[in-house]
Amino acid sequence: VALIVIRCGSDVSLELPPEATLLDVSAVPTRKELRALDDAAAIALPHDPTPTLDEIAAQPDVRHLGTPELAPQAPHLKDPLRVVVVGTDAALSVVLTRMMRSDYLWAELGFVPVQESTVARNWGLPTDFESALSVALSAPVRPVPLIRNDAGLAIAGSASISEWSNGEITGEIIVDDHVVVRHEATNTTGIGTYGARLVPMVDAPGILAAKAVSPVAASASFGLAADTAKPSGFGAWLRSKFSSPAAPGQLDEDTVCTGRAVQAGGPELRVVVDGVSAKRPVNRVTFYRHLRDLQVVRP
């Protein structure tokens, strides 16, 4: 097995087998830093004889969107390639995006989180570093769906859709044919309708989502100042006496639903993938299950 360990912006000590290749990259790797990964994939599989993405999409059935499956390229590999990412969920998202765009998701993928991680919870990874490293190096592959958006970004642990200003959302969010959010913003600062959070599942259909009833994150994390505007009018002043800003990240458990795709539309939406916000607002976004599954190494 060819083993590449990508250590992202960290000097954490790693006990690795002698055959491992260690890549030290930025906390959020650049495309240039990941070229060695592209080269390793090309050596492991110089030619992919399996159906292309276009050919899979043209298939009349949807078998490829059922239970996640082992990569069909496995029997054709010169040597299996295992990639282990040591870093944050955001770092893993960048590596996944690179693998997805270059179409070598057949590579085995392990993850060793260096801080609190939604990915680790989703995949059932150990909470201590040494155990997580051991799993990443030696555990078998258990495929999971890969969720991406229409901007070509892969989601490692979670994503959110909210108002660009971080206030209540104006817009609509739909999971398959189920409406999770349909709302026009008001001036509330407490519990309200702020958007939705979604996480990839480890099985079909692929996406779990729920309505956000408080800001998806603290305004400071988006480079926004906290809202210090004084309430306008007697009604707004009266409401302010009986409400307070809601703690970020609260979800409405009664709205939890699953599906293969999430679509959203609104005047100024903020899209956040694994804690990293898009640089500018959009008026529509779609998250959906990719045609190839992730070959995840997990317990």
Language-model segments: which ranges?
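Feature detects long, helix-prone N-terminal segments enriched in hydrophobes
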Residues: 24, 82, 89-90, 96-98
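Gly/Ser/Thr-rich loops at beta-strand to alpha-helix junctions
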Residues: 10-12, 84-93, 114-118
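Short, aromatic/basic amphipathic alpha-helical patches
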Residues: 13-21
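Short, acidic Gly/Pro/Ser/Thr-rich loop/turn segments
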Residues: 11-13, 163, 294-296
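Extended, charged low-complexity segments
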Residues: 249-299
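Catalytic core of DAGKc-family lipid kinases
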Residues: 4-9, 17, 28-36, 42-79, ...
